[in-house]
Amino acid sequence: MTLFSSITSISKTNTSSKSSVNSLSGSSLSMGSNSVACGGCDKPAAGAAILANIDIKAKVDLSLSAAAAASAKCGACH
């Protein structure tokens, strides 16, 4: 059984695209066409955040360190 309830992806030529991943606990990650994954502020547990990053890495080939650095820069929690 997977942690994520849905993966939604919208992609069109000559327009911006955005992908998002929602977990069963309500937390989510989103990624624009010109950015790396940006996590939301409602992190129920550190373990859930780590699992989310691992799942994103498997699907779009992001490194965990790049995702962690990006979440600090995205401004979602500020």
Curated annotation (Swiss-Prot):
Q: A Pfam family matched by this chain, by name?
A: Coiled
Recorded source organism is Dictyostelium discoideum (Social amoeba)
Q: What is this protein called?
A: HssA/B-like protein 30
Q: Which GO terms describe its biological process?
A: sorocarp development
Q: Positions of the region Disordered? A: 1-32
Q: Which InterPro entries does the protein's record reference?
A: HssA/B-like_chaperone, HssA/B-related
In the record, the note on similarity to other proteins reads: Belongs to the hssA/B family.
Q: Which domain of life is it from?
A: Eukaryota
